[in-house]
């Protein structure tokens, strides 16, 4: 599904950083930890949300 707007644990807004993180870390060759540092995501709970998220909207869409 889509990235949550806020971290489930602390409530910090993380959704606004998803596109840049995906572009730089997943599609590019940058280290995900350094990208998260550059984006200002310091808490381990927020970092977990960004690193472990998988876009499943294309997989689920045919069943709706």
Swiss-Prot record:
Quaternary structure, from the entry: Part of the RNA polymerase complex.
Names of required cofactors: Zn(2+)
GO biological processes: DNA-templated transcription
Protein name: DNA-directed RNA polymerase subunit Rpo10
Catalytic class of the enzyme: transferase
Top-level lineage group: Archaea
Annotated function: DNA-dependent RNA polymerase (RNAP) catalyzes the transcription of DNA into RNA using the four ribonucleoside triphosphates as substrates.
Species of the source: Haloquadratum walsbyi (strain DSM 16790 / HBSQ001)
PROSITE patterns per UniProt: RNA_POL_N_8KD (PS01112)
